[in-house]
Amino acid sequence: MISDESDNFNPRDPRPADAGKPSKNEKRRAARQLATQALYQRQIAGASLNEIEAQFRVDNDFTFADLPYFHDILHGVHAHLTEIDAALAPCLDLTIDELDPVELCVMRLSAWELLYRVDVPYRVVINEGIELAKVYGSTDGHKFVNGVLDKLAPRLREAEVKAYKR
């Protein structure tokens, strides 16, 4: 007898049919993590963006990550690097060249989301940036990233920030 998933259906099982599958938010978080690593690799090694993306597709399991979002981040940050760095500069006490490379990658990714992904709420962008800095940055790097993003968000998303603070 041929078995398929419908054979396992149990109407008393409270779990949704897609239980165990990552949510959209979880897939985006994984895409941000992989993109942070890829942006760092690009910054340090200087390999081409297409080579890095191809390597990441081979070396990583994208089952739990949003591959199109990973692609958008990687290419979006690269394409808009001048605008991103210009947006970050007034919020920094250091020059771009003086920043920790990992924290710079995280802040560039977050700035890209604030500038070009208005579908992602600014509070989510800040929180995700902080979490990335906690995982990949220096011991207190997340505090620095938080401070910069807290200054950057109102500059780039003034109406959204004001609406939230009411």
Swiss-Prot record:
One of its GO terms (molecular function) is RNA binding. It comes from the Bacteria. One of its GO terms (biological process) is DNA-templated transcription termination. Keywords: RNA-binding, Transcription, Transcription antitermination, Transcription regulation. Residues 1-30 are annotated as: Disordered. Residues 10-25 have a biased composition (Basic and acidic residues). InterPro entries: NusB-like_sf, NusB_fam, NusB_RsmB_TIM44. GO terms for cellular component: cytosol. The keyword Protein biosynthesis does not apply. Involved in transcription antitermination. Required for transcription of ribosomal RNA (rRNA) genes. Binds specifically to the boxA antiterminator sequence of the ribosomal RNA (rrn) operons. Belongs to the NusB family. HAMAP family: NusB. This is Transcription antitermination protein NusB.
